[in-house]
Amino acid sequence: MLNAGAIPIGRTNLPEMGLRLDTDNPLRGRTFNPWNKKLTPGGSSGGEAAAIATGMSPIGLGNDVGGSLRNPAYCCGISSIKPTIGRVPGVHSGAMENIGLIAPFLTDGPMARKVEDIKAGLSILAGRHIDDPNSVDVPLEGKMPEKFKAALVKEIDGIELPPATVKEIEEAGKILSENGWDVEEVKAPELDKVFDMWGVILVEGGMELAPKE
């Protein structure tokens, strides 16, 4: 980003160690949702999402293991994307091998108010870096499919989705369909087992991050 002419403004708030869907910590305090203080800005990149939503900066950076870019973007009404692992090189100050099983799920990505800015930011971030052997240098855009397809999931075993959530999912499917997408309502298999497995992975990662005596 610096090589492309970006001017860093500052660092924004996040919860301790990340991995939380809210943004609060003892050092900097709580970050509020910019549109309603009674709601969360999401996490763990909640400070960045709130700053972008209020116009403090046009574009920002965060990282995502299980939703830390996507969740705050949703909560604050902005755009983001979790790039495919390896698309954006993971060049960090800490050793990634020390965070356990969650390491292969971690990737950096852009946050912005507009999808067009996400596209521009991702084009700058993406590519191979000598310090990340998992990074790849492949084109961001390829041959477009003849027909776009979307699977609509409105039910998850063991979880009762709020009616408002189901309504928004249906509305999203309607908009896609009106724009030429092939939208099919499906039942995703074994999502309940996915939650169990993900819980184990997160707990293991937390143990790796815990102070050692």
Identify the meaning behind each predicted range:
Residues 2, 163-189, 210-213:
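Acyltransferase
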Residues 82-173, 190:
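A short helix-breaking turn/cap at a secondary-structure junction
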Residues 70-73, 141-144, 198-199:
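Short glycine-biased active-site loop of nucleotidyltransferases that positions the nucleotide triphosphate
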Residues 145-153, 201-213:
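Short helix-loop capping/hinge segments that flank enzyme active sites or metal/cofactor-binding pockets
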Residues 165, 194-204:
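Short glycine/threonine-rich loop-to-helix capping motif typified by GTGT followed
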Residues 2-122:
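Short glycine/serine-rich loop segments
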Residues 11, 62, 153-155, 186:
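Generic beta-strand/beta-sheet core signal
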